[in-house]
């Protein structure tokens, strides 16, 4: 397999992981903005487990704590507290520090209900299977290199939302988060962060006519196929 195809497959896998993160982890499991068909939810969960290693309950807890203390003391990764570059480059450290605190995870996810995959004892190590899949596709060393690129870019794109999209960009609402359409294109809409902080339970992140939330058409398609149900949207006047 030539390097171009390896790069294409790696970047496609990256974007699939990004879409799974925003649709399953963020909008569905963390904020309850939509419901997913159990099979669809399980597939998105499996993709994330294999190719990111994220444990959904930990992710939801850290993110809910971020909203609770947004850009105030207690925020797990505020660039106003730690600095933009520190969060951009060190967001994974801040995330792991919080995610490893079991008391914090329980506190911020009292409503959590494990799905079938959560209950499997080996799911914490599923990312090793994902790495093996890359190696089977591309060979050991090229596969390891492609997997590393995928993981680093995934972490960096998530970090960019938590850092850049709190300090750089425009605001529709009076909160410290910002909107950046360029980052929204790369993160399936997550870069519309000012909108999200105003209406955190909304299944749609775009509110103005010029804003594009790439994950929203996918959610609408799933809903049209009876595989998802949107539960929350922003107030009509906010989306004007």
Residue ranges and their predicted role:
Residues 108-115, 172-192, 196-199:
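Active-site-proximal inter-transmembrane loops
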Residues 1-160, 164, 202-240:
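Non-catalytic, topology-defining segments of multipass membrane proteins
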